[in-house]
Structure formats: structure tokens, C-alpha cells
Amino acid sequence: SRRGFVNFLMGSGFGAMAVWMLYPVIRFLIPPKSGEPTIASVPVPWKPAEIKANSGRIFKFGSQPGILVKTPAGELRAFAATCTHLNCTVQYREEKQDIWCACHNGIYDLNGKNVSGPPPRPLEPYKVNVKGDQIVVSKGA
């Protein structure tokens, strides 16, 4: 009947409009899976003797930057080199012995703890293992 056909068209239109409006909300609530495989550890391209005390070097941990720091006392520490404020890459400042984000002047201590500026959280710590002349950095400090 004509009434059934009109009801079908109206219902279909409202249904399509509801899907059109809810799709972005659902995409926001359920983020897509990352295409990058999970990486547990990486070898860094330097030997322990090549890294002087009170220095830092940036390395790749998968597709993300990491920072390897040799403290003034000679201890190796590693962190995710992504600032927890707006994801800028951090760097080590030898003269101040801290990890610094140049984007908004965020400062982290040598334990990765946020000490000043806008960063809301500490840097993600990594575990450092020295095996002979090889330095291996792993997640899960």
C-alpha cells in the first residue's frame, strides 16, 4: 500500500540519518588498531664505551623515539623520548643534567619524572641491559 511505502521511506531515512550521526561517535570511542607490531626490545647502535658520562642520545624504538642517557655517575637509563604534554621529542641537556622538551619548556629529571613545565606525567621508562658490547633497551622497566 501507499501508506506502507511512505512509512518504509521515512523509517529508512531516519535510520540512515541515525547511522550517519552515530558513526563518528563510535569511531571516537573505539580507536583503530595500530598498524605497527608491538616491539618488546631493540638494540641501540652504540657500544657502552662510545657513550660518555653526562650525555644523551636519541634512538628509534620501533617508529617512536627513545632517549638513552648516561648519567654523570655513569649509569645508563632509557625512556620514551616523547614528551607527555604534546608528544614533542625530548633531548638531554648536559649543562643542566636534565631531559628537556623544547616545545613548551617541559623538564624531566634523570629518573624521567616531570619536574616543571606543562608535562602531566613522567616519561615512560625503559629497561637497559648491557650484554658485552651491546646495549639492549626493552619496555617494562
What kind of region is each of these model predictions?
Residues 3, 7-95, 122-141:
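N-terminal pre-ligand scaffold of iron-sulfur
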Residues 107-108, 128:
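Active-site and channel-lining beta-strand-loop segments
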Residues 110-119, 136:
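A membrane-cytosol interface segment of integral membrane proteins
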Residues 97-105, 115-124:
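Short cysteine/histidine-rich metal-coordination sites, predominantly Zn2+-binding motifs
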